[in-house]
Amino acid sequence: MYYSSGNYEAFARPRKPEGVDRKSAYIIGSGLAALTAACYLVRDGQMKGERVHVFEKDPLPGGACDGYKYDIGYVMRGGREMDNHFEVMWDLLRSIPSLETEGASVLDEYYWLNKADPNYSLCRATVNRGEDAHTDGKFGLSDKGAMEIMKLFFTPDEQLEDKKITDFFDDEVLNSNFWLYWRTMFAFENWHSALEMKLYLKRYIHHIGGLPDFTALRFTRYNQYESIILPMVTYLKDHGVQFYYDTKVVDVQFSLEPGKKQAVGITVDHKGAVETIDLTEDDLLFITNGGCVESCTVGAQNKATGFDPTIKPGNGWDLWKRIAALDDSFGHPEKFCSQPELTNWESATITTLDEKIPRYIQKICKRDPFSGRTVTGGIVTVKDSAWLLSWTLNRQQQFRAQPKDQLCVWVYGLFSDKPGDYVKKPMRDCTGREICMEWLYHLGVPVEDIAELAEHSANTVPVMMPYIDAFFMPRVKGDRPDIVPKDAVNFAFLGQFAETGRDTIFTTEYSMRTGMEAVYRLLNIDRGVPEVWGSTYDVRALVDASVKLRDGRKLTDMELPLMGRIALKEALKKIEGTDLEKFLRQYNAI
């Protein structure tokens, strides 16, 4: 496998891999990484769909990319923010037919939508019960804070292993708008991995200017299950791929010899009926190890989620622990799933039932939430919330079957263990109605109306996810297994806990990249995998980000010691009248 960039490789179709007709594939899980692997097996691997088998422990596909209507109401555990340079995602979705527009792909539909209705926020944060916090697009970083970020940016990965963000940032960064934007947009906590923070900075350096108002982001028309997962599953079923639901893979058997590691069997549990499937070297096994939504608990309007991080038999953590015990190259799951108090947060889906709540939403987001177009344009963070509450409305309806007079709001709190500001209980102990009350309080709803509106004008379903931030925990090389471990001949790891270079976790792109790389490696497909977008190597992006991170202040305005000021002055004299001077002026650096 090799990486590539540019249209030559992007538009090429690979030859059929040698020996693919005698191979079969077994995929554990049906999340985005697993479905991507299945799609690439069919599209570029040219494997017959009937020879691809997908095992899913739940009754529906999609993993964390959910969006369903249950008896208790609508549920979206999370949302997906997309980037125009998710190179693998767009490479695949250009081939997945739209379910709504004949002759169009999912990418076509997405591209047209975001051209016609570009994303941007009119209110990024609130304070004092619904007042605009007036972050005003500013990062609010001092020169010292900017230098702390720059230092992290240039620190070698090896020096960041097992380091926390607070090992590099002090209050100059942590009390700034920059950190407010960053931690709530990406769900970072202060104690999370400094290495992952650095990778994020380098990965999205071209979007620094678009973070304060979310112009950097793009969204699907509906929830991610209906907009992404269903089209992929339909494509796979149309090609004959076999899906097995309510089916847990509880163990994997390996033959581990010097120079050769082979998966030789999987133990499958379908509703209590257990069987072992033998695997040969021509049977390719794709393992989704770990899982950010494992052990989640769902509440209801009048039921709290509680907090139960127990790792249950047959889930992604249990399987990974069993596998990891066999060989050190299979990773170290305990680094990620041993401290659920440091990896959890809680979300809730609030469905409005009448016209009473939407007017408070419109007052803050300054848009008609029923227009079918962008509403909040990303999350609105309640800056003075004890739960650090954020909420968002994407284009409504978020579900195709959603009544047109209802809105689906997604809410999440980073601090599920802190008492609320209105409801004096931790979020994890609150019913859906009580979470809605806390949200309404921060919207500025009159206190005397809060209980009535939460009870009769909304239905709220909370979800506690003990391991939703597990991949952000500090780590060292080897804690996550390589996608295809050294000497592996017929198996690969998939998803957020498999290791690939330069890309960042908690994104659709990371999951899809692991799926593509796994297939390309095991089948030796002769076509380049799109490399991670290289803006970190683009001097234009670097200079532009340096200026915007300092809210437009020029390099000549930096607080420097005397010798630094003299050196800068002399350097500027040297470049006077050159293209370098023109370049720096073009990007307002001088």
Say what each PLM segment does.
Residues I205-T220, D282-L284, N289-T514, Y520-G534:
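C-terminal segments that line or cap access tunnels to active or ligand-binding sites in enzymes
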Residues Y120-S121, D479-P481, A492, F497-F506, ...:
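Glycine- and aromatic-enriched mobile tails/lids
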Residues R13, G19-E148:
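N-terminal glycine-rich phosphate/pyrophosphate-binding loop and immediately adjacent elements
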Residues G103-Y111, Y245, R527-Y537:
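Short, glycine/acidic-rich hinge or "gate" loops at secondary-structure transitions
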Residues M1-A25, R43-R51, K69, L549-I590:
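Extreme N-terminal leader/targeting segments of oxidoreductases
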Residues M1-Y3, A37, L41, G45-N84, ...:
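Beta1-alpha1 glycine-rich phosphate/pyrophosphate-binding loop at the start
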Residues L99-H206, L217-F219:
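Rossmann-like flavin
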Residues K202-L284, T288-G290, N302-K303, D308-W317:
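Helical element adjacent to the flavin cofactor pocket in flavoenzyme catalytic cores
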